């Protein structure tokens, strides 16, 4: 049998946030190291995190950026745009202001050479439709990130599906974030907080409560999410927690989603990019909370050949492991699974 068409691997520089925030490495260093350590070929950046003054670009920046990407042997996969409607301190941006805010970022993405722009849920179906002519003119694809606590079942995402079906444009799509499809709380988070003297009884209570939420299924309203936050805060107080320990409870609600992996099939025709979110790799080379085998097989079965950006978010609590090595471990895991898929298909 001829070779299967497989997704391509890459990385988002967001995975290396601790190094960047600590100024251990510059933006330019991270591009170079991603190439040197074979963490590409796909390269994704978050505009506002990576470039001072974004979306304005300094003189000569584009030429220098493209040269560095080429020298690193990388390919531009996606640029993360922000859709922060709460920029003013006393109000939210209105739709005209948010349209202008997003349009500027689309122009910058084009100038930098990115084919795909990640957008966030503040961008409504109406706003996506308003931005579509510009995206088509610039030959850009806008991908709405589906990030925990949202899921393919959330009304905001369902409304976008309806609008996509109406508009029928290849310049509109979705970006699944695997953090929406966990099977358990990340063990590395529990271990880190235990080492920080968070009471074991509290961590066990969080773990059990997350399992209860998981059995109940995805949330579809802000009220449901608020109730889950309150429940975790109640546990924190009951078991003698503090401002540190409450973080894992809030993360359990906001970051670690309950969507069934197979449910991504509902939006698979519109998948234009993937955030390969992960939190840790165990001694067996597996990610214990994110079901990589199921997720990758689903992409292969759907014929998806775009990029998967490795996105290590364990840095929120894990300050000891090397982010570069963590991404390398995930790439090894994904390549191993691709090999298993090819073997099952009889590929030689």
UniProtKB/Swiss-Prot annotation:
**What is the protein name stated in its UniProt record?**
3'-dehydrocarminate deglycosidase alpha subunit
SUPFAM superfamilies, per database record: Xylose isomerase-like
pH dependence per the UniProt record: Optimum pH is 7.5.
Please give the cofactor(s) recorded in the UniProt entry for this protein.
Mg(2+)
Its activity depends on temperature as follows: Optimum temperature is around 40 degrees Celsius.
The record's listing under InterPro entries reads: Xyl_isomerase-like_sf
Q: How does it assemble?
A: Heterodimer composed of an alpha subunit (CarB) and a beta subunit (CarC).
Highest taxon listed in the record's lineage: Bacteria
Q: How is its activity regulated?
A: Activity is strongly reduced in the presence of chelating agents.
The protein's GO terms of the molecular function aspect are: lyase activity; metal ion binding
Output the Gene3D superfamilies linked to this UniProt entry.
Divalent-metal-dependent TIM barrel enzymes (3.20.20.150)
Function statement: Carbon-carbon bond-cleaving enzyme which participates in a carminate degradation pathway. Cleaves the C-C bond in 3'-dehydrocarminate to form kermesate. Also shows weak activity with other C-glycosides, such as 3''-dehydropuerarin (3''-oxo-puerarin), 3''-dehydroisoorientin (3''-oxo-homoorientin) and 3'-dehydromangiferin (3'-oxo-mangiferin).
Q: What does the UniProt record report as the effect of altering residue 313 to A in this chain?
A: Almost loss of activity
Give EC number(s), comma-separated. Answer: 4.1.99.28
Q: Which UniProt keywords apply?
A: Carbohydrate metabolism, Lyase, Magnesium, Metal-binding
- Signal peptide range equals none
Q: Which family does it belong to?
A: Belongs to the C-glycoside deglycosidase alpha subunit family.
Instruction: Tell me which residues bind Mg(2+).
Output: 145, 177, 275, 311
Swiss-Prot/TrEMBL catalytic activity: 3'-dehydrocarminate + H(+) = kermesate + 1,5-anhydro-D-erythro-hex-1-en-3-ulose
Catalytic-site annotation from UniProt: 147
